[in-house]
Every structure is written in structure tokens, then in C-alpha cells.
Design a protein with these regions (language model features):
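N-terminal capping segment at the start of a domain
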Residues: 21-50, 62, 186, 258-264
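Alpha-helical metal-binding/catalytic segments enriched in His/Glu/Asp
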Residues: 88, 100, 106, 111-158, ...
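Second-shell loop/turn segments in exported
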Residues: 36-46, 74-77, 113-124, 137, ...
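A non-catalytic alpha/beta surface segment that caps or lines the substrate-entry region
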Residues: 41-91
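Zn-dependent metallopeptidase/amidohydrolase metal-coordination segment
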Residues: 230-277
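Metal-dependent peptidase/peptidase-like ectodomains
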Residues: 152-250, 299
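Bacterial Sec-dependent N-terminal signal peptides
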Residues: 1-21
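His/Asp/Glu-rich mid-to-C-terminal helical/loop segments that flank catalytic regions of hydrolases
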Residues: 258-306
Length: 306
């Protein structure tokens, strides 16, 4: 009886704590995407396709289902060349979806001598690492919401990938049931509010942040957009879904009054706060685990422009 009890407790511990994401995992995913070998992941390059395949492999590790067809890779055309977004599904108890996204492309390399690779660790390998971390968290759990994970291509060329996938009729079965989209854009550094905090672009357009914060665990907080005048809400991939009248916001930690790495060669792993990222990812997972269609149904107000 004691052995059985010990075994039961051991199994309980495994399944209770297995979803906790390690800093080593966060480092591995982000460092791979932001490595020199990826050469800045510019859309249309072999390295960009390598990044897409790497993300697809991570989705497979997490046993995600395909969004459409027989692959995580969702093709679209870029200057006569086939390029890819990456998309995977986690079925939950409800058929209502929460979406998690970021963009994996960056701006490639320059012609100058020395360090000429724009690694894009913060922009936006950090966002992809965050959504992969959420998928990791729920690998052995069944969330209340179903979940869709989307890694967009071509953001740096004008949000091409998010525009393509948001208008893909093969995914309407997801979009018609989507409660909200969390788009992660530059979350590698500590925010102006300190650790364990993000801000939401366009916070004045919906009550998503309020509803999320009501359920947030361990001090995690989504703050108001400190750069509202720059209208970042309309300048990132979330806007492709805003146009579909889906609740969609971007979430960031970057302090734009201090950051010197945006679209520069020094946006590499050396500027990443892996402890903070790991804390945020785990607390996002724990908070999302509390959300259901009963306590999380955000709505736009009449201030948003579609």
C-alpha cells in the first residue's frame, strides 16, 4: 500500500510539474533561432526556411496538430518564391481558440566587414521562443481553450506572412472560433516596470488586459501601452487579425527609450534576460491554464479602427 501511494504521488508530481519550462530550454530555442548560422533569417533565404523547419520540429515535439493540410508549414508566395508560415493546433476542452504568435523572420545580413549579421534575438526570436514555451507548458495538459500557435514570416517586409495566413480560407474553422490572439513582439529584455511584466499595444481598444490581469498568477502583469502615440497596435502582425475583427494585441517588454539594439547587429543573445523570459513564460502558462470561455471573453470597444 505504501509503495502504491508513493508511486501515485510520484506520478502526480511528474504530471503536475513536468510542464514547468526550464531556462535551458528557453536558451536553446532562442539561441538556435538567433545563431549566426541562421544569418538573420531574411525571408526568401535558405536560412529563413531552415528556421521555419526548426519551428515545425518544435511543434512536432509538442504533438501539435496541423492547422491545414499535412504539414505545419503553410505556404504563401513571396516574389515568385514559395515561403512558409508555421502553424500548429492544441485541442482543448472547448472549441473556442486562443492564438499565440510571433514572427521568425528578421533582416538578414549587411555587406560591411566584421559583425554583419542581424541575429534578431529580441526581434523576434524571443516572441517565437515564448509561444513555443507555451506549447511546451501544455504538452501534457488539456487546456480549457483550444490553442493555435502561429509563427509568421515576412513581418519585416510589411507583415506579409500574417496577412497571408489571416486570409487563408483553410483556417477559417479556427478564426471563426478565435476568442483572442496574443502576438509576442520583442520580449527578451526587462520592461520599464521591472521583471515579470509586459505591456499590451492598443490597451485602450479592448478589455483583454483587464481580464487577463484578474487571473494572472505570481505577480505577472500586463501594463498599458507606454507608446500609444506611436500606434504600435496597427504596426505589428496583430493588425492582420484586427482587420478580421478578432481581438488581437501585441505584447512586448522592450523599453524603447533605452533600447539600442532594434534592427542593429547587437540584437543577439547577449542582450537577452533569460531568467526574466523563463519566469514570464511559466507564469503565462499558469495564467492561461486558469482561463476558460466562462472567465475570459474580451471585447473591443468603439475606439478601435478596423
Amino acid at each position: 500500500m505504501k509503495k502504491l501511494t508513493y508511486l501515485t504521488l510520484s506520478l502526480f508530481s511528474i504530471f503536475t510539474f513536468a510542464q514547468e519550462i526550464s531556462k535551458e530550454r528557453v536558451k536553446t530555442v532562442l539561441s538556435t533561432l538567433a545563431s549566426d548560422e541562421m544569418k538573420g533569417r531574411e525571408i526568401g533565404t535558405q536560412e529563413n526556411e531552415n528556421a521555419a523547419n526548426y519551428i515545425a520540429a518544435l511543434f512536432k515535439e509538442n504533438n501539435l496538430e496541423y492547422c491545414t493540410g499535412k504539414s505545419y508549414l503553410v505556404p504563401f508566395d513571396y516574389n515568385g518564391k514559395t515561403v512558409y508560415n508555421v502553424c500548429g493546433i492544441k485541442k482543448g476542452k472547448s472549441d473556442q481558440y486562443l492564438g499565440f504568435s510571433g514572427h521568425f523572420d528578421h533582416i538578414g545580413t549587411s555587406d560591411k566587414s566584421g559583425d554583419n549579421i542581424y541575429n534578431g534575438a529580441d526581434d523576434d526570436a524571443s516572441g517565437i521562443t515564448t509561444l513555443v514555451g507555451i506549447a511546451d507548458y501544455f504538452k501534457n495538459k488539456r487546456p480549457e481553450f483550444s490553442m493555435v500557435f502561429m509563427a509568421f514570416n515576412g513581418e519585416e517586409k510589411g507583415m506579409l506572412g500574417s496577412r497571408a495566413i489571416s486570409t487563408d480560407k483553410n483556417l477559417d474553422h479556427i478564426y471563426n472560433k478565435m476568442t483572442a490572439l496574443f502576438n509576442f513582439e520583442m520580449v527578451a529584455t526587462e520592461s520599464q516596470w521591472g521583471k515579470n511584466a509586459l505591456y499590451m499595444t492598443g490597451d485602450g481598444f479592448s478589455d483583454l488586459d483587464e481580464l487577463f490581469n484578474q487571473n494572472a498568477v505570481n505577480g505577472l502583469k500586463i501594463n498599458a501601452d507606454p507608446y500609444a502615440k506611436q500606434q504600435l497596435f496597427y504596426r505589428s502582425d496583430n493588425v492582420s487579425f484586427v482587420k478580421k475583427k478578432i481581438i488581437a494585441h501585441s505584447f512586448s517588454t522592450v523599453d524603447m527609450t533605452k533600447a539600442s539594439h532594434y534592427h542593429h547587429e547587437n540584437d543577439d543573445v547577449n542582450i537577452v534576460d533569460f531568467d526574466n523570459m523563463t519566469q514570464i513564460i511559466n507564469n503565462l502558462g499558469k495564467t492561461l491554464d486558469k482561463l476558460s470561455p466562462k472567465n475570459f471573453a474580451p471585447k473591443y470597444n468603439d475606439q478601435v479602427k478596423f
